[in-house]
Amino acid sequence: MEYKKFIGLNDDTIKIRTSVFIDEQGFKDEFDEIDKTCSHIVLYDNEKPIATCRYFREGENYHIGRVAIIKEYRGKHLGNKIMQIAETEIRGKCKESKCVIEVSAQVRVSEFYEKLEYNAVGNIYFDEYCEHIKMVKEL
């Protein structure tokens, strides 16, 4: 399994996110202005794109988001893998002694992020129809 980094959207990122967030979960506004300039990671299995996420800095903190694994590859710890890659990339860019990463997690998968040592802060809010919670981790 290998990964590649991209600045801005590419076809593989679009394909994975469309499959997961639009086709499966019914989101309508999946792509935004941030996608044009942020970093994206794509995991590949024999050149097949299977997982993606994006990360970017906003103010003092970094954000990881749009974590998506195609259906047939779920349950293989690829979410852990892509989050570790993103955190390593952020750690390399972080100039401060402490580095805070924020995630806007779907409430239904917040336990996944808790296992990666992210803590929920604030209240549940809606992104389109789906409950989300802000979660943070200090590196």
Where are these regions (language model features)?
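Conserved catalytic-core motifs of GNAT/GCN5-like acyltransferases
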Residues: 102, 114, 119-134
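Helix-loop element at the rim of GNAT/NAT acetyltransferase active sites that forms part
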Residues: 15-28
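Conserved acetyl-CoA-binding loop-helix of GNAT-fold acetyltransferases
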Residues: 69, 75-89
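Conserved acetyl-CoA binding element of GNAT-fold acetyltransferases
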Residues: 60-71
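Short acidic/glycine-enriched loop/turn segments that link adjacent beta-strands
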Residues: 36-37, 60, 127-131
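Conserved beta-hairpin
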Residues: 29-53
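A short beta-loop-alpha structural element at the N-terminal edge
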Residues: 1-13
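Conserved GNAT acetyl-CoA-binding A-motif
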Residues: 83, 89-106
